[in-house]
Amino acid sequence: MHLSQLIACALLLALLSLRPSEAKPGTPPKVPRTPPGEELAEPQAAGGNQKKGDKTPGGGGANLKGDRSRLLRDLRVDTKSRAAWARLLHEHPNARKYKGGNKKGLSKGCFGLKLDRIGSMSGLGC
């Protein structure tokens, strides 16, 4: 197993073990996300009938701002974690350049050991 894959698995296990401890004890379960157009249309339709001075619970702009900021915050965290995992799981684009297996002049012996010049020319390497 490659070292990068081993590190990625270890990090995944570490993140999964930390995940339940980060959960807040009083948070309600997340609701399924709706498309952005419908999300904006529903609060405007519900809040359009209320007057400016109305102090009813659950209505008004404060709740709308809170919902929007929560959605944006969740989206931002999700994007950051996806980018981090993508960097961990994908090798460097020029990784082939750093691997020594495809360079000229690197002859491999019988057991993967590099043969010296004399052994490779005389055939006594194996």
Curated annotation (Swiss-Prot):
One of its GO terms (biological process) is positive regulation of cGMP-mediated signaling. Residues 1-23 form the signal peptide. Coiled coil: none annotated. Residues 24-73 form a propeptide. Residues 26-35 have a biased composition (Pro residues). InterPro entries: C_natriurtcpep, Natr_peptide, Natr_peptide_CS. One of its GO terms (cellular component) is extracellular space. Disulfide bonds join 110-126. Residues 19-71 are annotated as: Disordered. One of its GO terms (molecular function) is hormone activity. Belongs to the natriuretic peptide family. This is C-type natriuretic peptide.
